[in-house]
Amino acid sequence: MANQATTTYKVTGTQKAVSNLWNTLQRMEVNSRNIWLDDLAKHYGIDYQKKHICVRGHIYWAEYEEDEDTSLLSFETETAWDACNDLFFEINRLLDDELSISYRCCECGCEVYYTHDEDDYFPEECCVSASGEPFEDCCDDVYGTIGEAIREWTSKTGIEQGERTDEQMMDFINEYEYEDDDTYFYIRTFTFE
């Protein structure tokens, strides 16, 4: 079974192009059911096999916002191993390259954490994967700074940062051995494309 990547997308562009994608998702009943990416590719007439575009996954949430200046479509996908960005790039090509696509991908199993941000939608520096006591049940949360993630860990464990730099402390936390083998707290920094 593949590891699951969760990717958050922020899509802007011309009102016509953004509305096209949003209206398509609405017709496919987004927010009522999962929208499988192969179905989305077929809707746009994309031969994903011929083009070697991965479509293993689905959109599980979307929302559209519009004001006088901006059309913004936000949605999240769950996909196998990595984000399926090539599908959305191909949809953009079909919509006359009128979309600006920003995204943040988190896949903790293979430690894939990256951001492509064409505006300022994803300023966060890192993602924390944590489970077990004294942390909550398995969760992945983004943090604005590595320092914020470190403070979260020190507040839960009672272990102080002391003279360690943030980099040294992050290494200390990532290598820390807990009494229970199922407990972990990993700070993973985003790569910015």
Sequence positions of predicted segments:
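Intrinsic low-complexity, intrinsically disordered or marginally ordered coil/linker segments
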Residues: 1-193
